[in-house]
Structures are given as structure tokens and as C-alpha cells.
Amino acid sequence: MSRKLESIPEKTRWEMATKGLTGAYIAISNALQRAAGKEKFEEFNGNFWHEAGKGAKEFAKSIGLPTDTPENIEAATHLLAQVSMGPELQIEVVESTKDRCVGRTTQCPWHKRWQEQGVGFDTCGVGHQRWGDGAVEAINPGFTFKLTKNMVRGDAYCEWVIERKK
């Protein structure tokens, strides 16, 4: 069986896994929001992604990533997101200082599945914010995360700020 798996190019396997994961979660989110309502969905989704974000600390530690500056924290969360979401995810840093780093997603598998499935509500805002909260708090509690733009809400890109606490 492994020979059959190895006959599929790695990029194709990664794309299929990404589409399967993000597509399934968007479909589940849609069903859950319809069954439980917006408030309960956002409560569940926020808690789910906050806990998931906490794994960023172990990820960064396991591969020896520095986490002492906003840019290092963004790089660690960026790499974890890229590994988790595959080649559809396109992220860039648009600002970086000693106290603040601004990241931007211009292509996102979650947003693509949201469009493909015609989901009519914000499946990402609370989850993205809470994932960022969990990740940044776990990696370095001296910093905060704030989602400032969201493609699902009509922005041209998603954007977030990692900032030193004042």
C-alpha cells in the first residue's frame, strides 16, 4: 500500500489533505451553526480554536524557534499554520518593529472552502481570533494577538497584529 501512496506526488497529497480538512470543518461549522445558533456556535468555535492555538508553544519549542519578539512569534504561528493548512495558505509580514508585527493572509484554504460551499455566515472570525489568542498567550504571554481584517467579512485579506503588552 505504501508504494501506492508514494506514487501520488507529495504536493498532491498535501493539497488533498488540506482540502479535506478545511472542507470538512467548514461543513461541520455550517451544520453546527444551523443546529445550535450563532451564539452557541461562536462559543464552541472560539473555545475549540483557543485550545488548538495553545499547541503553538510546543510546536515552536520542538523545532527550536525563537519566541522573544513579535516577528519571531508571528514566524512561529505562520509556520504552524502553513504546516497545518498547506500550500493554499499565503501569508506575508507587512510591518515589523520591536513591539509589533502585522501579518496578512492573502490566500486561505478556509476562505476558499467557505466560498465553495456558499456558507452565508462568518465561520472564521471568532475561531481565528481565539486561535491567535491561544497561540500567542502560550508562546509568549508578554504579547497579544488581534485580528483586524477578515476575508469572510468582505475584506480583501485577513490581517492581525501581534503586539507587546503595555
Predicted feature locations:
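N-terminal accessory segment detector
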Residues: M1-R100, Q107-V126, E137-A138, G142-Y157, ...
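ATP phosphate-binding glycine-rich loop and adjacent ATP-lid/helix-beta elements
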Residues: G127-G132
